[in-house]
């Protein structure tokens, strides 16, 4: 596999993590609940999926357990923010710290373990032909099942939110919970549902990370991807289709820094300005420097959101971060 094909394949793998986590955060925020605990939910999903796969040898069962672990931690966030009306930011950060601590403690004995996770696969019948397409064949038509599921999730989430009664009611809860309640929509129930579904997506992202992307467990292996997923929701302006674009953009940056050690862009020493450009290129392509690119891009995205305040204000759910107090007659 050429460097370019390998880079694209790694981009797909890295983008899947961000896409799943970002879609889950989007659903939660559409209901008016900010979830900053995505990082912690991804970690418990990664560890839960890895342990079950290591014990049973069944990576699908491990993937399901990873989803369940993310949903369990999300249920705690929902209880704190919806029932107890706690500050959503504080609750989310606390759950990220909790998830990090729990997985570091309980996962310490699994660091040296190896598993057989999701294998790369091709589409039935046509896949064996598509995989031979130049450049994109190896990247997009020989991936893991979770990569395909993440791509499928984009139109599914779009249809769920904008074409189903349940999705439209969730959006209504995030825009104007008082009016939704007046129309008979169970605000608390749907907010719980959205947050827990979002946690399931985060758990799936973590399970993909440990069962497909790396097929190993390392404490803190999400390395900030949960925070990037939260920023991606702003980048996407709460739209699933734009989430796909953002996930692949950040996935490319993530993959580029992972594969930068095998890349050489040195100019011919006799070329003009080679003495100036070679040190600059070597610095920019340094793996330690490149590891900061996804996070620098995240800062740039959030800065752009601040500059484009009006467009973001129009896109953000009106009741985001707002607790709902139902008035009793």
Swiss-Prot record:
Q: Does the keyword Protein biosynthesis apply?
A: no
Sorted UniProt keywords: Cell membrane, Membrane, Plasmid, Sugar transport, Transmembrane, Transmembrane helix, Transport
Entries under InterPro entries matching the protein? ABC_transp_permease (IPR001851)
**Membrane-crossing segments per the record:** 3-23, 32-52, 60-80, 89-109, 139-161, 193-213, 216-236
A GO cellular component annotation in the UniProt record: plasma membrane
Pfam families xrefs: BPD_transp_2
An example molecular function term from Gene Ontology annotations: transmembrane transporter activity
- CDD domains, alphabetized: TM_PBP1_transp_TpRbsC_like (cd06580)
Cellular location(s): Cell membrane
Stated membrane topology is: Multi-pass membrane protein
Chief localisation class: membrane
User: Subunit arrangement?
Assistant: The complex is composed of two ATP-binding proteins (TsgD13), two transmembrane proteins (TsgB13 and TsgC13) and a solute-binding protein (TsgA13).
Protein name per its UniProtKB record: Putative glucose ABC transporter permease protein TsgC13
Q: Which organism is it from?
A: Haloferax volcanii (strain ATCC 29605 / DSM 3757 / JCM 8879 / NBRC 14742 / NCIMB 2012 / VKM B-1768 / DS2)
- Could you read off the lineage of the organism from its UniProt record? Archaea, Methanobacteriati, Methanobacteriota, Stenosarchaea group, Halobacteria
């Amino acid at each position: 596999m050429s460097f370019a094909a390998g880079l694209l394949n790694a981009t797909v793998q890295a983008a899947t993590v961000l896409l799943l986590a970002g879609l889950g955060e989007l659903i939660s925020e559409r209901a008016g609940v900010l979830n900053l605990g995505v990082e912690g939910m991804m970690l418990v999903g990664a560890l839960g999926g890895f342990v079950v796969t290591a014990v049973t040898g069944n990576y699908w069962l491990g993937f399901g357990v990873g989803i369940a672990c993310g949903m369990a931690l999300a249920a705690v966030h929902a209880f704190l923010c919806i029932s107890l009306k706690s500050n959503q930011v504080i609750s989310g950060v606390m759950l990220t710290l909790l998830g990090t601590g729990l997985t570091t403690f309980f996962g310490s004995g699994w660091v040296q373990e190896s598993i057989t996770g999701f294998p790369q696969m091709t589409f039935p019948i046509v896949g064996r032909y598509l995989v031979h397409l130049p450049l994109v064949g190896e990247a997009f038509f020989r991936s893991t099942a979770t990569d395909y599921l993440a791509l499928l999730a984009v139109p599914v989430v779009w249809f769920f939110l904008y074409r189903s009664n349940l999705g439209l009611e969730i959006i209504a809860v995030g825009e104007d919970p008082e009016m939704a309640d007046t129309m008979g929509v169970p605000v608390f129930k749907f907010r719980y549902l959205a947050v827990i579904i979002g946690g399931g997506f985060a758990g799936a992202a973590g399970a993909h990370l440990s069962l497909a992307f790396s097929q190993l467990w390392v404490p803190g292996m999400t390395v900030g991807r949960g925070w990037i997923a939260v920023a991606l929701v702003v980048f996407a302006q709460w739209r699933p289709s734009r989430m796909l674009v953002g996930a692949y953009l950040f996935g490319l940056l993530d993959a580029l820094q992972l594969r930068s050690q095998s890349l050489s862009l040195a100019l011919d020493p006799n070329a003009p300005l080679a003495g100036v450009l070679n040190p600059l290129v070597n610095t920019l392509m340094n793996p330690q420097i490149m590891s900061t690119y996804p996070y620098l891009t995240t800062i740039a995205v959030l800065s752009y959101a601040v500059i484009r305040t009006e467009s973001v204000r129009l896109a953000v759910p009106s009741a985001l971060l707002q607790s709902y107090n139902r008035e009793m007659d």
